[in-house]
Amino acid sequence: MDPQPGATPYSAPAGCPMHQQQTSLYGPEFAADPHRFYDAARTHGPAAPIELAPGVDATLIVQHEAALRVLQNPALFARDSRRWAALREGAVPMDSPVLPMMVYRPNCLFTDGAEHLRLRKAVTESLSRLNSSRLSRDVERIADYLIDQFIERGTADLLNEYAKLLPLLLFNQLFGCPGDIGDRLTRSMSAIFDGEDVLRANAELTECLMELVAIKRRQPGEDITSWLIQHPAGLRDEELKDQLVMLMGAGVEPERNLIGNALLLMLAGDQPGAPERRGSGLLVEDALDDVLWNNPPIANYATHYPVRDIELNGVTLKAETPVLISFAAANSDPGLTDARQTLSKGAHLAWGAGPHVCPAKSPATLIALTAIEKILNTVPDLSLAVPASGVAWRPGPFHRALVALPVRFTPTAARRAGNGVQAPAQTSAQLPDPFRNAPSTPSVTPRHAQEPAKKQKGWWSSFLDVFRV
């Protein structure tokens, strides 16, 4: 992988789609059909020049073998984005929407060497203390609570009312958040993921996590925050906050996409426009494997910075420039024919590889499996409210994420509605378009419908009122 004298920077031939709109990973064309771009890129080599956002250039690795060589070679490919020359030189717009996912933070995602080992050990050993039985119970309780909010209605957006909220509330549980802090954490993380007033949301997120760390130093519990505090690495408050932010960022968005994409696959069945491997009759485990292969929740990420000019299979990767791994393209590499035929769990790169491989593969899989089984068992007649070909995907270079997942089902009574707990209201404006003008369907009258209005609580406070945890 050392530089070779004859190696030249990769350049796509004129007229190739790589020189046209598909070069940009942030447009609606890419969101609608990313594999068209990956196929075009792959015909020109293991890597391709891309634009992540206006004014933000990078290289995308699209070959499985090349991706492994980058992921497994930290001596030549660093993760510390302070090496990014264009950013240091002021050539990257500071208001770019991709910077929050790329700028340096002192957590185990953006560090190298001994510092990475110290931080990662604290994180992995804290995660290893999670009890799988307790984790499943926590997911089931949160799932029951969320399902109760829409089960009387007969319609729902399973992406925004279920897959998105479940991991947010679960992390409140795993972090040991009191009601008020959990409400603020849920609100701020939702705003950050949705790109709404990000600066204010980031400030609120920092404030509530620092408060949480202070509380857990005084009153530790059986939760990840306390375990990180107690770890022999001796993390400072700022370091604790940064690891918690990393855990939420790396856990919430991918988890909701994994749940949402798998539900789409299973509900689409044999509809035209359904994902390539039809979901009819799939077991949940098979659906998750299919998504990790074909629609990985994080499609392009794991940004590396070559420490010097490096030749990779005939392509020169310039020093101190961002090199991203396309997990989606690497998984669809034609060279993986045998592995793809069996969807071998050991061959796809959805969890990454090398020293930065995802440390939460097992709990993340358990969470998605439990969440999907719970909704399918509780609402057995779920069906898509739109054709599979009509679902929209969120634009952006990093994720493979649905905009919404509208479904219909037979309304039934909420099991905990009599407790007098009112979750944050879902208005028709928040529901996908098919529900706004749809003919009315019979529904069970909520038992709290005639109660006087109460002061609105956040999602986490409302959940705690139900379960008293």
Region locations from a protein language model:
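Active-site substrate-recognition loop segments, prototypically the cytochrome P450 B′-helix/B-C loop
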Residues: 2-159, 168-186, 190-192, 434-438, ...
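Cytochrome P450
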Residues: 173-177, 264-277, 332-334, 414
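Cytochrome P450 catalytic core segment centered on helix I
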Residues: 175, 184-233
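Short hydrophobic alpha-helices at membrane interfaces in multi-pass membrane enzymes
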Residues: 235-241
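Cytochrome P450 catalytic-core helices
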Residues: 241-248, 252-279, 359-379
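Conserved cytochrome P450 K-helix E-x-x-R motif and the immediately C-terminal K′/meander segment
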Residues: 279-313
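A translation/RNA-centric and nucleic-acid-associated enzymatic feature enriched
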Residues: 313-314, 319-335
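Cytochrome P450 heme-thiolate "Cys pocket" and heme-binding signature region
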Residues: 338-405, 413-421, 431-433, 439, ...
